Amino acid sequence: MENAKTGTTTVGIVTKDGVVMGTEHRASMETFIAHKTAQKLYKLDYNIGMTTAGLVGDLQVLVRYMRAEINLYRIRRKMYMPVGAAATLLSNILNERKFFPYYVGLLVGGFDSKGYHVFAIDAAGGAIEDKYASVGSGSLFVYGVLEDRWKDDLSLDEGINLVIRGINAAMRRDAASGDGISVATITKDEGFVELSQEEVEKRMKKLKLK
């Protein structure tokens, strides 16, 4: 049986002050918009967040697995799991199922003693760290914005605006992406903090994206 095509747009970037992660809200099946407020941005722990693209059932199972393992790590070792360790754990879970895979594309981001990190992880468990990454059907449009505007000394505030710009570009051209934007920051001082929808809307108006 042929799998129904789904789509989404997710973004993660590293700034000098923290990590910014964002997604849009649309869940689709082929040309049908199945849901307009789908959650694709998750807090795994104080220092780690994850964005999800793919089949909802697979994504929700993986989020539960990761939260459980990360909580056990913190309880046993009295410390937060490093971001690289979380990416490796998720990579191993996916690789074990590579012949009967989870249909997902994931971003894991956050901070640890070595700094701020973003990892892109594919359905076969391939994990690549980069300063910025995008996963999903809208990623081609996002990368155009990121390549043009990302810089090494990007501030957290600039990073938030850049993620919003990137997702907005995808929503304009990718039919499988739309219906709003979720954004979260992950910093050493405040951990994982999701912006309110009012704040996102305010920034979009200030950037003249609405």
Curated annotation (Swiss-Prot):
Chief site of localization: cytoplasm
Protein name from the UniProt record: Proteasome subunit beta
A Pfam family this chain is assigned to: Proteasome
Catalytic reactions of this protein: Cleavage of peptide bonds with very broad specificity
Domain of life: Archaea
Propeptide: 1-7
Keyword RNA-binding: no
Enzyme category, top tier: hydrolase
One annotated GO molecular function: threonine-type endopeptidase activity
Active-site residue numbers: 8 (nucleophile)
Gene3D superfamilies, A to Z: Glutamine Phosphoribosylpyrophosphate, subunit 1, domain 1
Function: Component of the proteasome core, a large protease complex with broad specificity involved in protein degradation.
Keyword Magnesium part of the UniProt annotation: no
Activity regulation info: The formation of the proteasomal ATPase PAN-20S proteasome complex, via the docking of the C-termini of PAN into the intersubunit pockets in the alpha-rings, triggers opening of the gate for substrate entry. Interconversion between the open-gate and close-gate conformations leads to a dynamic regulation of the 20S proteasome proteolysis activity.
GO biological process, one term: proteasomal protein catabolic process
Subcellular location: Cytoplasm
Organism: Aciduliprofundum boonei (strain DSM 19572 / T469)
EC identifiers of the protein: 3.4.25.1
Keyword terms, alphabetized: Autocatalytic cleavage, Cytoplasm, Hydrolase, Protease, Proteasome, Threonine protease, Zymogen
PROSITE patterns linked to this entry: PROTEASOME_BETA_2 (PS51476)
Alphabetical list of PANTHER family matching this protein: ATP-DEPENDENT PROTEASE SUBUNIT HSLV, METALLOPROTEASE TLDD
Any single GO CC term annotated in Swiss-Prot or TrEMBL for this entry: cytoplasm
Family, per entry: Belongs to the peptidase T1B family.
SUPFAM superfamilies, per database record: N-terminal nucleophile aminohydrolases (Ntn hydrolases)
Complex and partners: The 20S proteasome core is composed of 14 alpha and 14 beta subunits that assemble into four stacked heptameric rings, resulting in a barrel-shaped structure. The two inner rings, each composed of seven catalytic beta subunits, are sandwiched by two outer rings, each composed of seven alpha subunits. The catalytic chamber with the active sites is on the inside of the barrel. Has a gated structure, the ends of the cylinder being occluded by the N-termini of the alpha-subunits. Is capped at one or both ends by the proteasome regulatory ATPase, PAN.
